[in-house]
């Protein structure tokens, strides 16, 4: 047995997960995921790589509860996502999962300040935006991602790399069980990408968060503890 897996509990499990889409003109189903099984240990940084159309984005969507598989089981910790109602699934994503997307437009709300963007998940969960603990957590995370003193500005005043660092801070603000990152460095220059990848790796090694990153970039994948390769909807 792999020692790395044996000493840690599972943060994420997929068992025989398949995702099939509706028939196209050819009359055949499109199989985006084909009987995928894997276990991601708690506190690890895992990269999922593969060419365009390999199924890696569908893997992330099913693993994060953004899409329901056609068959198979997905668990976050001990929670089977298949048994959850849409409302319960929304609460789980809000409370136990953090997200970092490739698009800055998806990551941040331009009408909110940088600090308000960071603490937004806490506010959506019912915290008062002006509460001392909420503000302190937001400022502490901005300091950690190298943006101390910038919280009062708008995200549009930041570079793409700085916006992604804000997105990482927001993903961590709820102290999630799992952070899912979808091509988080795809539009960044090498220096900015390195900063973002360092923050994700630090979240796993320092905080014990489980990070699952989808990427087409082998350099980015090299920052992870484990690399899963997808091709044709299957893990290779």
Give the ranges of each region predicted by the language model.
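Conserved ABC ATPase signature
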Residues: 154-158, 162
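Helix N-cap at the start of a conserved alpha-helix in ABC-type nucleotide-binding domains
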Residues: 190-192
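Catalytic Walker B motif of ABC-type/P-loop ATPase nucleotide-binding domains
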Residues: 179-182
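Conserved catalytic motifs of ABC-family nucleotide-binding domains
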Residues: 175
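ABC ATPase NBD coupling module
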Residues: 81-98
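Conserved ABC transporter NBD signature motif
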Residues: 72-80
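Short coil-to-helix segment of the ABC ATPase nucleotide-binding domain corresponding to the Q-loop/switch region
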Residues: 110-120
